[in-house]
Regions:
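Mixed-charge interfacial surface used for oligomerization/domain docking
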Residues: 2-12, 16-18, 22-23, 75-79, ...
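Short coil/turn segments at secondary-structure boundaries
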Residues: 51-55, 149-150
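N-terminal glycine-rich phosphate/adenylate-binding segment common to multiple enzyme folds
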Residues: 53-84, 88-90
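N-terminal glycine-rich anion-binding loop in soluble enzyme alpha/beta folds
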Residues: 1-52
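Structured helix-beta-strand junction loops
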Residues: 42-43, 63-64, 70, 138-141
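Short catalytic-loop micro-motif centered on adjacent basic/acidic residues
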Residues: 48, 69, 101
Length: 195
């Protein structure tokens, strides 16, 4: 559910990087996601991610009078902190310009819901403060549920033990989870099978 463009609004994607010993993938809409996924399935080394830095966020904010940024959960990435630092710097260097940064406390699909709601508010011509207030209200009513087919990537980046990932693969176990109110990705249950 990556979001690279959003019709009807001036939109900028500030991407994460996916890093292996052999390659660096920039999740910006031009990346060959299927090719990367195939490579990672057979890759034996560690993988990691890198969040956008303050300069990346400042480049995205450049020239705008009002900026609304929605980040991946701050519990998984430093994106929110970098976006906040960039917001402070941008507003200091550009008096009168305003930046609102929202930690989605989530990933993917919920971020899309937030971005689409933001677009709709802007299309209605709402004022900056009203948009910020409504986004905080709306955010309380969105949630993320997810299903993981494989734990391989979590094992490669040290979040689960490789033996656990291998056992889950052999037994056909899928993890069903949700994003908590604090932005943690929590396991709800484990199930077996394809669907």
């Amino acid at each position: 559910a990556s979001l690279y463009t959003l019709q009807g609004v001036d939109f900028e994607c500030v991407p994460l990087k996916i890093i292996t010993d052999d390659a660096e993938y920039l999740d910006n809409g031009t990346m060959d996601a299927l090719g990367m996924a195939q490579t990672l399935r057979t890759y034996k080394g560690k993988t990691s991610t890198s969040c956008p830095n303050v300069s990346d966020w400042l480049a995205a904010y450049e020239g705008a009078d009002e900026v609304y940024a929605i980040t991946i959960t701050g519990t998984l990435s430093g994106s929110y902190n970098a976006a906040q630092l960039a917001a402070e710097e941008y507003q200091q260097e550009n008096p009168g310009k305003r930046v609102f940064v929202l930690d989605s406390l989530s990933t993917g699909p919920e971020q899309r819901l937030l971005a689409e709601h933001l677009r709709d508010l802007l299309a209605e011509g709402r004022e900056f403060d009203e948009v910020c207030e409504e986004m905080l209200r709306y955010h309380k009513h969105t949630h993320l549920l997810f299903s993981l087919e494989s734990l391989a990537n979590l094992a490669r980046n040290g979040r689960v033990k490789p033996a656990v990932a291998a056992m889950a693969r052999m037994l056909g176990i899928r993890v069903i989870g949700q994003a908590s109110e604090a932005g943690e990705l929590d396991v709800l249950c484990k199930t077996r099978g394809e669907h």
